[in-house]
Amino acid sequence: PHLLFLGDIKNPLDAKTAMGVLEWRPEHCIGQFRLPGCEIDLGLPDLSPAAALEAGARSLLIGVAPLGGEIAPEWMESIRLSLASGLSIVSGLHQRLTAVSGLKSIADAKQLALIDVRVAPDIHQVATGRKRTGKRLLTVGTDCCVGKKYTALAVCKALAKQGVDVTFRATGQTGIMISGSGIPVDAVVSDFVPGVCEYLTPDAGENHWDIIEGQGSLFHPAYAAVTLGLLHGSQPDL
């Protein structure tokens, strides 16, 4: 179970990781940890790391997804406090916990884990464009944060309820935290994004559906490259 860290954020869009995990895995969420000035409330109990540990939490999950994916300096005291209190740290940010000076030594001394979710696998696979068996659906949108992940999860849940052979394929950090597997495609070297998407959605049975979490938008000047790589690599039927 997690203590969801919200820092001092004011924009609800910045809390999309915490909101996503709470929506789809509420049983994994013990409480929220907010700093002064935070204007986001998930409706969970406000807990200190020590109180969360006592309530059953085993990790502090950084529930914030700021532009650029950096750990704000003002969060570091809370992260260190969480480690000192006995909580492992889970992060979906680009900046790795293991690269932050001093964190690993604290975690090692307490026998705790620093879990960086947004790390690309060591897969240097160039896309072939070969048509694969099985069926695929890729969620797309006109912007970031418009519901591509939620839609993919909802479609997957509905199909599974009807007995369809279906798999949710996470391509972002929050989707991976929710489903327990996937590849954070925005951490992959650009040459290999389509190939990694082929790897993520391999040959499957004739009636099997892969529901693929979309990223960004073709209209977005910053993230369209990831979107296009997903489109080429997933070869969606829908």
Kindly give the residue locations of the regions a language model identified.
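Flexible, glycine/proline-enriched loop segments at strand-loop-helix junctions
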Residues: 90-94, 138-146, 183-188
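Redox-cofactor binding/interface segments in oxidoreductases and associated redox assembly factors
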Residues: 61-65, 91, 212
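ATP-dependent carboxylate-amine ligase catalytic core
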Residues: 1, 9-11, 15-35, 45-50, ...
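Glycine-rich, highly charged phosphate/nucleotide-binding loops
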Residues: 39-54, 66-76
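Structural motif
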Residues: 58-59, 88, 209, 238
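Extreme N-terminal, non-catalytic leader segments
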Residues: 78-136
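Walker A (P-loop) phosphate-binding motif
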Residues: 124-168
